[in-house]
Amino acid sequence: MSDSNQIKNSSQTQQVNTLSEEEALVLSAHLKEQRSSGIPLDSDQKSIDKMIAGLGDPRGLLRLRFADSLGSVGQAAVPALCNAMLSSDQVTVRRAAAKTLTLIEDPNSLPDLVSAFLNDQDSVVQGSAMGAMAAIGEEAVTPILNLLSHPETTEMQIGLANWALAFIGDRGSKTLRNALSSGNSTIRKAAIAALTSRIDTLNADENKDLLSNASNDDDSEIRAEVATLLGAMEDTDWAKLLLISNLDDPDSWVRKNSVLSLMKLNAKEALPKLEELELQEKDRIVVNVLKLAIQKLRQTD
């Protein structure tokens, strides 16, 4: 596939100014000297355009120097970088522009980052655009959550969005907590995963209510995910009680995950309930997991 076909609505692509190999070398050396001397880089439009042209150079080290230089220029370079990311006919330039925006962390770039994420057919551009959104932090949470419910978002893009939310984590906790009441189960699931993505946040006292409420979510996938998370809780007594109640869940996947977490927590007090369920369970996979858990827990009795 040619570069010009990498962006939806490819008629809108633009040809970025190019530098000859010699021009790129001279500019790169000049930028290196300025930065080494502590001299602020030129931030006029002509200088920025030259550095952006350098993002299309075939030599990776030179591209990196131009990207770092644009990152040093900062917000003044954002409009031109966004334009290059959205409209360049060179995929190398679009990729480099998106990666460079990660260095600047400017919330004003969010609309263009969302557009590149949705419309550019190149997966590297998509990933770099999402990386730039993650670097921005809290202000990017709502746009990222909105992408989860976008009708054209692919499974790969959903994975990238979930990664970004987990990366933002505590920095976006207020917005993520508000998302727990969303009518969209995909958004609720992403918010829970982001808020509990690290062991310290998972075990924070304020997240107990989150996990308790999520254990009763209408979406069985969320309940199953919570059952797995409970197996990593440090407050094992609290987690065990919730997991034992989950053993009566109508969804077999929730029951299976609850049994596995109880086994992980060495919940010997759950043995009577597990033995009772073994006789009643109809799902063959859950029965096998029950047998394994009962055997393991009896060995530690």
UniProtKB/Swiss-Prot annotation:
<keyword id="KW-0042">Antenna complex</keyword>
<keyword id="KW-0605">Phycobilisome</keyword>
<dbReference type="InterPro" id="IPR004155">
    <property type="entry name" value="PBS_lyase_HEAT"/>
</dbReference>
<dbReference type="Pfam" id="PF13646">
    <property type="entry name" value="HEAT_2"/>
</dbReference>
<dbReference type="InterPro" id="IPR011989">
    <property type="entry name" value="ARM-like"/>
</dbReference>
<comment type="similarity">
    <text>Belongs to the CpcE/RpcE/PecE family.</text>
</comment>
<dbReference type="GO" id="GO:0016491">
    <property type="term" value="F:oxidoreductase activity"/>
</dbReference>
<protein>
    <recommendedName>
        <fullName>Bilin biosynthesis protein MpeV</fullName>
    </recommendedName>
</protein>
<dbReference type="InterPro" id="IPR016024">
    <property type="entry name" value="ARM-type_fold"/>
</dbReference>
<dbReference type="GO" id="GO:0030089">
    <property type="term" value="C:phycobilisome"/>
</dbReference>
<comment type="function">
    <text>An enzyme involved in the biosynthesis of bilin.</text>
</comment>
